[in-house]
């Protein structure tokens, strides 16, 4: 039967989206926007005349057709990559696998990745995102960017971006918040770190009201919900400067609290490779700017 001419890029985007389990994580791996991933998958579905994913409130669910297509593409792209590496003489390319906190990846690292690739083409950087603490050894990684206070047993770590936290919300809601005590009248969105809001209210000198809003394991998810006016989120300001600059979020109060910062970590007993050293120097340089 006649088959449509399927664009290789759309097939590749679908393969990555299936493997990562979300358009957001696929966008990080491919270094494009989430909208670009969604567009390419929709284009492929249109050409094939069938849905490859079900879009639900719980995320992406592959259809039977998507599950049928994925292993064929995964094997094909893997085989193609191996052959191209041999033909292109990529023996000097050094793979570096880095696990990254999702918020840091999307809000800080992604806008800078192309500059790193241009400056260091000899490093094949492979990013894996995680909303919780990245486990380097268990996940087969070389390094990880974590949020916390440092001092992880068996690991060396260097500090990166600071992350003072403050309440952020939609500008319309911010205009109605005149005093920190007013936060007791609105929904307080929260992360799984339950001490954050009480710590901020202590810094503000105001009793902490009941914090009963929905819990999220991602600051990006909290920020997106806050932009809709659904409540106030306690977020690391340095990660969401673009949201504030674009008028999507506003900071109603100047009080901040620090519960940790971002670190680059690696196992203490692992000798640093050239790629690890290069990436470490680049990250610390970018953080200092």
From Swiss-Prot:
CDD domains (alphabetical): PBP2_LTTR_beta_lactamase (cd08484)
Broad class of the protein's primary localization: cytoplasm
Subcellular compartments: Cytoplasm
DNA-binding region listed in the record: 23-42
Recorded GO CC terms: cytoplasm
GO terms, molecular function: DNA-binding transcription factor activity; sequence-specific DNA binding
Cited Pfam families: HTH_1, LysR_substrate
Keywords (A to Z) from UniProt: Activator, Cytoplasm, DNA-binding, Transcription, Transcription regulation
Span of domain HTH lysR-type: 6-63
GO biological process: DNA-templated transcription
Entry's family note: Belongs to the LysR transcriptional regulatory family.
Summary of the function given for this chain in its UniProt record: This protein is a positive regulator of gene expression of cephalosporinase (AmpC).
PANTHER family per UniProt: HTH-TYPE TRANSCRIPTIONAL ACTIVATOR AMPR, HTH-TYPE TRANSCRIPTIONAL REGULATOR
Protein name, entry field: HTH-type transcriptional activator AmpR
Organism of provenance: Rhodobacter capsulatus (Rhodopseudomonas capsulata)
